[in-house]
């Protein structure tokens, strides 16, 4: 049976992550409060950020920026802004 959490991003009960995917206290906070669905949404945004901003995950500043964006997205409800990206409309 899947573990459920009260997802802070989705604002509802949902299936939780199978295991802690991120290290440290932030990782525990994500594991305890973020659903698999919300994490998948973040992963898509993360990929776009890395690609569009040409982030280097070996660079400490780039990792710090990405972590800030993750916290803003998952816990503070702030949308990730990606310069030049225009979401596809449903009727296209």
Swiss-Prot record:
State the source organism's domain of life: Bacteria
Record-stated family: Belongs to the Fe(2+)-trafficking protein family.
The reply to whether Iron figures as a keyword in the UniProt entry is yes
A GO molecular function assigned to this protein is: iron ion binding
Task: Please spell out the taxonomic lineage of the organism that makes this protein.
Answer: Bacteria, Pseudomonadati, Pseudomonadota, Gammaproteobacteria, Alteromonadales
Q: What is this protein called?
A: Probable Fe(2+)-trafficking protein
What Gene Ontology cellular component terms go with this record?
Answer: cytosol
Q: What does this protein do, in the record's words?
A: Could be a mediator in iron transactions between iron acquisition and iron-requiring processes, such as synthesis and/or repair of Fe-S clusters in biosynthetic enzymes.
Q: Which UniProt keywords are present, listed alphabetically? A: Iron
GO BP annotations listed: cellular response to oxidative stress
């Amino acid at each position: 049976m899947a573990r459920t959490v009260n997802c802070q991003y989705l604002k509802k009960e949902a299936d939780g992550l199978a295991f802690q995917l991120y290290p440290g206290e932030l990782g525990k906070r994500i594991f305890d409060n973020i659903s698999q669905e919300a994490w998948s949404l973040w992963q898509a945004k993360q990929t776009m950020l890395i690609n569009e901003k040409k982030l280097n995950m070996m660079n400490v500043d780039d990792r710090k920026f990405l972590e800030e964006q993750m916290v803003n997205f998952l816990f503070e409800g702030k949308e990730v802004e990606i310069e030049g990206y225009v979401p596809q409309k449903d009727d296209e």
